[in-house]
Design a protein with these regions (language model features):
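Acidic/polar-rich alpha-helix caps and helix-coil junctions
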Residues: 1-125
């Protein structure tokens, strides 16, 4: 757990509790050399908190957990590549849209756990 994560957890928890959290978000942003965000509330504030989660934890394996927690699901758009100076879509790369309620967002309970504790019920098909 890093200090940046603690600020993000505090910002998100404050937002969920009473709609605040901007001060935690701005504290983190100032430590990263970014400008403070002013007069944000509601959906705009939550959007900024989500964006900061993506920036702060990029490549660290948090993204799917965050998307599930927020109920956002996962959306992958067709890949693009540069050809002759123009950005073109690759028809061999399919779009993907997985809602947060999809079973693929749930990790199956480990077999050792279900064998050791017969009271555990299978949580995945």
């Amino acid at each position: 757990l890093r200090v940046g994560e603690m600020y993000l957890i505090a910002a998100e928890a404050s937002y969920m509790k009473d709609g605040s959290g901007l001060s935690f978000l701005n504290d983190l942003r100032s430590k990263r050399g970014a400008t403070a965000l002013l007069n944000l509330s509601g959906a705009q504030l939550f959007s900024q908190i989500k964006d900061e989660w993506a920036r702060e934890t990029c490549g660290e394996g948090f993204r799917l957990d965050c998307l599930k927690r927020w109920g956002d699901g996962c959306r992958r758009m067709a890949a693009q590549h540069l050809t002759d100076g123009f950005l073109r879509n690759d028809p061999n790369y399919l779009d993907l849209n997985v809602p947060a309620t999809d079973k693929h967002f749930v990790w199956e309970l480990p077999q050792n756990d279900t064998q050791a504790n017969t009271n555990l019920q299978k949580n995945w098909e």
